[in-house]
UniProtKB/Swiss-Prot annotation:
Subunit structure: Homodimer; disulfide-linked. Interacts with TXNIP through the redox-active site. Interacts with MAP3K5 and CASP3. Interacts with APEX1; the interaction stimulates the FOS/JUN AP-1 DNA-binding activity in a redox-dependent manner.
Post-translational events: In the fully reduced protein, both Cys-69 and Cys-73 are nitrosylated in response to nitric oxide (NO). When two disulfide bonds are present in the protein, only Cys-73 is nitrosylated. Cys-73 can serve as donor for nitrosylation of target proteins.
Protein name as annotated: Thioredoxin
Domain Thioredoxin: 2-105
Compartments where found: Nucleus; Cytoplasm; Secreted
Organism, scientific name: Rattus norvegicus
One of the GO BP terms on file: response to dexamethasone
Length: 105
């Protein structure tokens, strides 16, 4: 299940709760066409990779989280391990998204 992050505190808690698991964060917006396009694929990955934590951040609802994470465009995917960012890319690239998950998971 993809967890919707609604505050800076919830984001920090989710990263901490993940422990050693890979955390994949989808920074998106409701008005973003490419975000809508990749969203079902992103959600399908959480069934395929049960050992990975999937988070979703709406940049309009959580501007502080997006600013802290230096998100400049949507969609941006960030990858965290043990609370530290280990990877990031922007764009609705399904192949790159899954390849990056398999690289870090």
């Amino acid at each position: 299940m993809v967890k919707l992050i609604e505050s800076k505190e919830a984001f920090q808690e989710a990263l901490a709760a993940a422990g050693d698991k890979l955390v994949v964060v989808d920074f998106s917006a409701t008005w973003c066409g490419p975000c809508k396009m990749i969203k079902p694929f992103f959600h399908s990955l959480c069934d395929k990779y049960s050992n990975v934590v999937f988070l979703e951040v709406d940049v309009d609802d959580c501007q502080d989280v997006a600013a802290d994470c230096e998100v400049k465009c949507m969609p941006t995917f960030q990858f965290y391990k043990k609370g530290q960012k280990v990877g990031e890319f922007s764009g609705a690239n399904k192949e790159k998204l899954e390849a990056t998950i398999t690289e870090f998971a």
